[in-house]
């Protein structure tokens, strides 16, 4: 789950393999459904933004989960309130019978704490504008996050970060489906142009000038 540039990333860690060809392990999925008392599948809704890639993502998940009997309905919402009161409201998640919510996330700072604090800390769950979409409240996760704020030794902090990633994934509440990379083009005529971490690692347009060659 942890992105490649954040401490805790381990490309060998894959607790939920999706078959040899990456298209899904149907037999294992059916076995897990039987194990939890739902051998014929179940019904739930998937939350998504009703524009851009949202409808296509919904259709893809609906089709793929349907292969093992899981019936997926849509819980679409406008992008303007999607993160604040749609999937950002634990009550609305329950009211809309949302079992999966499509969301994007990135660390404000490239640290394990910066990546996980808002989306995995059970002490940070809000009534609205909540970023811990599954309302995960695992004491082990909370404790690892607390330890990260105090650990000054990099090697020990990196080990805590790996433990944190593995503990979150043990709860099976997040499914990483895509890691975005953005290509930035800088026109050679621009001067004093740089990425500002304070504005989300975007160009700081306030200080941009022209006159370059």
For each predicted feature, which ranges?
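Extracytoplasmic/peripheral linker and loop segments enriched in polar/acidic and small residues
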Residues: 22, 73-84, 95-96, 104-107, ...
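Long, contiguous, secondary-structure-rich segments that constitute the structural scaffold
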Residues: 33, 205-210
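Short, solvent-exposed loop/turn and secondary-structure capping segments
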Residues: 57-58, 112-115, 189
